[in-house]
Amino acid sequence: MKEISESYVPAVVENEVREYWKANNTYRETRKLHESGKPWLFVDGPPYTTGYIHLGTAWNKILKDAILRYHSMTGQHIIERAGYDMHGLPIEVKVEEKLGFKNKADIEKYGVAKFIEECREFALTHKDLMSEQFKDLGTWMDFDDPYQTVDKGYIEAAWYTLKRCEEEKMLERGSRVVNWCPRCGTAIADAEVEYWDETDPSIFVKFPIQGTENEYLVIWTTTPWTLPANVAVAVGEEFVYAKCRAVKDGKSEDLWIAKELAEQILKYGKYQDYSIIETKTGAELAGTKYISPLASAVPMQAQIEHRVVIADYVAMENTGMVHIAPGHGWDDYLVGLKENLPAVCPVDGNGNFTDEAGIFAGKYVKAPETNQEVIDVLGDAMLAVRKITHRYGHCWRCKTPIIYRATSQWFLKVKDIREKMLEEIADEVTWYPEWAGSARFHDWVEEARDWCISRQRYWGIPIPVWVCPVCNKYHVVGRYEELEQLSGQKMTDPHRPYVDDITIPCECGGTMKRIPDIFDVWYDSGIASWATLRFPEKPEDFGKYWPADFILEGHDQTRGWFYSQLALSTIAFGKAPYKSVLMHGFALDAEGKKMSKSLGNVIAPEDVAKQFGVDVMRQYILSANAPWDDMRFSLEGVKTNHRMFNVLWNVYKFPLPYMALDGYKPAAKDGVWDPSAVEDHISEFCREDRWLISRVNSLAEQVTKEMEVCNLHRATRPISTFILDELSRWYVQLVRPRMWLEEESVSKMQAYDTMYYVMRRLVTIFAPFAPHITECMYQNLRCEGDLPSVHMVDWFSGNDALRDPVLEEEMEIVQEFDEAVANARQNGKRKGRWPVGTVVVATDSEKVAGAVSAMNDMCCDRANARTVTVVKGVWDKLDWTAVPVMKVIGKQFGRDGPKVKAFIEEANGTKLKALLTADGKVSMEKDGFTAELTEEHMTFEEKMPENIFSSPMENGTIYVDVTLTPELEAEGYSREVIRRIQEMRKQAGLAVDAKIKAEVVIDDARVMPLVDSKHDVIETEVRANCLKIRVPDGETCSCRVADEAILAMDWEIDDLKVRISISKAE
C-alpha cells in the first residue's frame, strides 16, 4: 500500500482505471474466470444507432452494468453481448435528412442500392460512436462482438422465425386498417405512434334519410377528409334518439339526434326552436338507409348502400351517432367485418386522394385546405362547424400526422395466442416491480391485435416471402441454404435490393418473386434472445442457455420490445423468451418535465460525467429512486453524491500514512489476503472495531438482499450512509487517537486491521455501482497474490458470525446520544472541543440506560465530558413551571377560573408536579375559593437550572452542564491551540511524523497560564520537541521559532488573539 493523492479527482482515477482494464484485458479475463459457473443469459435491449446517447440511455446502461457486475461477482457465467437495432425508420429518416430527401420518390430516384449503403454506413458509424459512449460510462459488455440486426446471421434468425410462424399457421396476408405514415409511405406499429394535441375541425353533418323529405341523421366527426369513404352510421343499441322538428329562418327540418344531446347540438346549428315528434332506440333505428351528401361529388358514394348499424363503442356524446369508414379506422373496420360493410379507402400511400374520391382526387388528406374543401362541398348538409383540440397520432420518426388506411399487409395472428401469452407472463416470468407484469404488460397483451409485420420501406430485414403472380401461391424461406437450393442462385447480401433479384420457379410454371416489404423493426429486435446466441446457425448454445435469465428496459417497452419478443417466442417456441424482467422509468428534469431541446432542459450524461465523474453519476442515478419510477434528475443530487465520494477518498486516505510509517502489512497466505486473521481474533478487538466489522457485514447482507430483487436504490443508499455516517463521522473520529500513537501498540495494529478489513469488504460491495474508484482503491489495497481486479473478487454477502446485532443497537444509541449532546451544546453555545463537567441521560428505557452504561467511556469521550450519568425517569435537578389549561379550567370553574389560573401560575411548579405524581390531585385555596385540581388542569414545562441545556434523543433526554471551571477552560483553550497547529502543519506540507518547534503567543495574561498548564499535552499532540507558550511581552522564545519559522499565523479563538509560529525541528 502506498499513500495516495490528497484529493479525489474523478477524471484521473477513471482514466487510469480504464487504461488498466485495457492493458490487462480485464473484462475478458473476468468473464473467463467464471466460465465454469452457473450460466446466466442477459439480453441487451438494442438501442437504435441514430446518434449520441441521452440521459435515459445512460441510466439504462448503468442499471444493466451494475446488475451484470453483481451477478458476475456471485460466480455466475455471464452470457451477454451488447446489442444494436440498426434497421428501420429511425435510421432511414436520419439518412433522408442528411441527403435532403422529402419522400420515398426521392429515394427511388437516388437509387435503392445507394440509399441502402448510406443507411448501412450511418448505422455502423453511429454504432461505434455509441459503443465508446457506453464504455465511458464504465459499462462492461461485449462491444467487440455485439449482436447487430444488420448481420447476415441475425437476418437468417429472423427468416427462420417467420418460417416457424408459417409452420404454426400463424402467418396471414390480407387487407386491414393500419396506422400509416404518408410521408414515410409505410404502415407503422401502435407503439410507434406518438400523440400530442392538435386543433381540427369539429363538424356536424346531416345525412338525408332515404325515401323522406327533410329528414336527416346528424353525425359528428373531426376528420372531414374521411367522409368520401363513409359507408354507414353507428348508433348505441339502447340509446334513445329523438326526431327533432327544428326551425331556422322559417324553415323546418326533422333531425335525428340522441335525445339527451339534442338541445345543445341544435344550439350549435343556430335553430330558433324545436320539438320532439318521435323517439326510437338505436336498435329500432338500425337498418335505416340514408344517402351520402357527397354522392354527387364522389361517384363511388352513389354506388354504396348506406345504412345505420349498431356499435358498442358509440358514446353518449356529440350527436350519439358515429360516421363509419371501415377503410379509415380500426373500430370502424371491426364494425365493417361484423356488418359486412365495404372497406373503401380512396387514399394512396402518400396520403393523397385517389380517383375514387371524385372531385377531391390528388389532394393531400391531412392538409387543412382539404378538410375545408370537403366542408365547402357539403354545403347545406353542414349543421355546424366548430373547432376541437384533441390528441392526434404522429409518426414516431418524422412527426407527420398519421392516417388510418386499409392496405394489403402481412400479419401474425397474435389474437390466437393471447391466452398463452398471458399464462406465460403470469406463471413463468418474474417482474420487477410485480405490477409491471400483472397490470401494465398484462393489460397490453390482453388487448393485443394481430400484428402487422410488413413495412413498405427499404432499410430493414426483407420479409422472406416469395409469391407467384400467376397462381398467387407463396413460399416462406427459413434459411439461406434453402433459398439457394430453391432458386439455384447464390445470395451475397440479404438486404434490398440484392435479395429482390433472386427468384424461385413456381410449380405452376410461373416465377415467384419476393414481396417488396421489409419487417417491422420491432420484429427485428423481437428475435434478439435467440439471435444473440447465433441460433439457428449454432443451435448448441440455444439449447444450453435459452430462455434469457434477465432483461431490462424502460416502461415504454411494454408496448415494444417486451411484447415483440413474447409474441414471436410464443409462436415459434411455445414459451416466453425471458425468465425475469426489470422495467425502469423515464429520465426527466428536476421539475418532472420531459427533457427537450425546445425547453432548454436537456442534461447530457457526458457533461455530468465530465464535471463530477462517472462513478458519482452512476451512484446518483442508481440511488435517486426506485428503478421503475421516473427519475427527476437533479444536479444538486449529483453534487451531494460527489461530496460522499470525497469523504470516501478521505477515509481511505486517512490511515495510509500511519500504516506506511509503521510498515503495516495485512495478513496473507501465499500472497493472498487472509481475513481470518481478523475473523478468528475478533473477540480481542476494541468495541468500536468489532462494531464496524459487524456493520460492514450487515451492510453486505443488506446490499445482497436488495440486489437479489433488483432494489438498486435500496442497495446503494445504505452504502452512502455507511461511508458518511458510520465510517467517516463515527469510526474515524473514534479511532484517530489510536492511529496517532507513536509507540508499538496492539490497539493501533487492531485499528489498522479493522480499517483494512472494512475497506476490502467495502470496495467489493461497492464495485458494481462505482467500478472505477473501487478498482483504484483495490489496486492499492490488494496483496501480491490477490486477483488482479476487484471485479474478479467473489461477491461478499456478509459473515453472520461477525455480526453483533446487540452491539450495533447499542452503538446506534450512543450515536443518538452523541447527536443529542451536540444539539444541547449548540443550545448552550459550547463548542465540541471544549470539555464540560457533566452530561446526564434521563430515560425509562433499559436499552438506552444499558448502552450508555456499557459504553460510558466512549460516551464521555464523544461528549467531551468528565462524567456521563444515567438517571431513571425524570432528573431530580430539574425545576418545573406549571401552565394552566384554560380551556378546561374555564369550562369547569366559570367565573372562578381566574383564581385557579392565578394559583397555578404562582405555585411552585416542581412541588405541584410532585403532588400530582404522588396523589393524582392537589387542593387549592385562593381568595376564599377552594377546589381540587388534577393533571387535566395544567401542563408542565421544564425549567432548566442555570447553565444546563437539554436535547431529546429517542427514549430519553440529554442534559449538558456547560459551567466552565479553570481546569475545563484550560483544556478547551489547549484543544483550540492544538487544532490550529495541526492545520498549520498541514498547510506547511509536513509529513505525519515530522517533528516541529512551536511558539504560541497569547494576548491575555489570564488565559496564557491556563494554556501553559497543558504544555505537555499540546507538545505531544502536535509532535513538537520544543514548545513555548507566552504573552506578547514575555521572554524571547528559547526555541528561536520566530527566526526560523516556516509558517506564522494570527488566529482568533473566541475573541482571544493568538499568534502561532512553527518551524522544523533539527
UniProtKB/Swiss-Prot annotation:
ATP binds at K597. Signal peptide: none annotated. It is an enzyme of class 6 (ligase). It comes from the Archaea. GO terms for cellular component: cytoplasm. Keywords: Aminoacyl-tRNA synthetase, ATP-binding, Cytoplasm, Ligase, Metal-binding, Nucleotide-binding, Protein biosynthesis, Zinc. A motif ('KMSKS' region) lies at residues 594-598. IleRS has two distinct active sites: one for aminoacylation and one for editing. The misactivated valine is translocated from the active site to the editing site, which sterically excludes the correctly activated isoleucine. The single editing site contains two valyl binding pockets, one specific for each substrate (Val-AMP or Val-tRNA(Ile)). Belongs to the class-I aminoacyl-tRNA synthetase family. IleS type 2 subfamily. This is Isoleucine--tRNA ligase.
